[in-house]
Amino acid sequence: GLRFFITDSDLFTGLFYVILLAATLIYLKICGDDIKTTLRIHPIHIGSFFLIILLAFTIRPVAGFITLIANLFFKDMTTTTMTQKVMQNLSLSILTTAFLPGLVEETIFRGVVYSRVRKANPIKGILLSALFFGIAHMNFQQFCYAFFLGIVFGFLIEASDSILSSMTAHMVFNGSSLLLTYLLSKTDIFNTAANTASGNVSSTDLTTIIASIPMALIGLVLSILLIIAIAYLNGRLGYMKTWFYKQYRASWPKEKSAGFSFFAAV
């Protein structure tokens, strides 16, 4: 494939995302979809923009806790590779690991996929798009936290009614991860992370997991409150509240969210 001709991993990743984005936009054109409507490219309340950036940090303790749990069962396949890429070229890594994934992955999963699977039931749509988002990361360790992030981004796009919100949160989350990796790689703290990544789980790691529970819970509560605030600022809170009323859910159409051919294509 392309990797046979392109040996630089960052260049390959960047080109891959550009091709993927082009293919996605061509798909929407072939289907006759209005790109702006399908992808929900709408302006967001300026105040909520800062809350979205804050959300990208409050979900980090939760994602970190999920990663620690996943490391007990699955080998971390990305930490070492990411560190090497960051140390070689931080700015290029931010482009190919933060900006492009935030742009392209959100276009696909919170844009195309979610627009198809939310038709009958937005809650199921969020879970399904998050499931596909997790699977797309191609390993069990990343699937665990990616599934969680997919749920957060799904609620976020509904709270703001704009894909720009999930793109922003995705980019900030990935970008801050790269910066954190860069800083940790210059300290002894990274050695502990490397041992965990290689599968050397000890009682100390279990203690770390237990100790991280309070921060994860605080991060989860703050994240929920931020999504509520974002929904309020964008005039979406009343609509989202109806999701949790049984009588309203009973009125949702009993139809398939998407056809078999769509799921097969995904």
Provide a role label for each language-model segment.
Residues G1-L28, L217-V221:
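Alpha-helical transmembrane segments in multi-pass membrane proteins
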Residues D8, K36-T107:
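Juxtamembrane helix-loop-helix connectors linking adjacent transmembrane helices
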Residues G14, F49-L54, S91, L95, ...:
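Hydrophobic alpha-helical transmembrane segments
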Residues D34-G64, I210-A211, F244-V266:
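Interfacial transmembrane-helix boundary/kink motif in multi-pass membrane proteins
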Residues V104-L128, F155-S162:
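Membrane-interface helix/loop boundary segments of multi-pass membrane proteins
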Residues N121-Q141, A146-I151, M171:
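Small-polar-interrupted transmembrane alpha-helices in polytopic inner-membrane proteins
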Residues Q142-I209, G235:
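Functionally important transmembrane alpha-helices
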